[in-house]
Amino acid sequence: MQFLHKRMHLNAGDTVVVHCSHQSNIILTTDSNFNNYRNGRQFQHHGGGGFFQKLPAHLRAPYSGYWNVTIDLGGGSGNVTHSISVIPA
C-alpha cells in the first residue's frame, strides 16, 4: 500500500485543504483508525474524505484533536507532488 501521511492537531471546524498532482483517495482519520487503515483492517474516516478526481480536496475536522491526513495513491507509483494546509474555523 502506497500512501502519503501527515499527522496534525486540528480544532473543531478546521478545514484541511489537500492539493495533489494525481487523483487519489484522501482521508481524515483518528489515530486508531489510521492504525487500522495502515494494517489493512476496517476503519472509518471523517470530514468528507474519499476519492477525489477534482482537487483541491477539502476535509473538515468534526472535533478538536490529533488527526491523520492520508493520500492513498491506489497502488500507483511515480512522482507525486502534494501540499496540505489548514484553514482555521
Regions found by a protein language model. Give the residues of each.
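Acidic, Ser/Thr/Pro
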Residues: 1-89
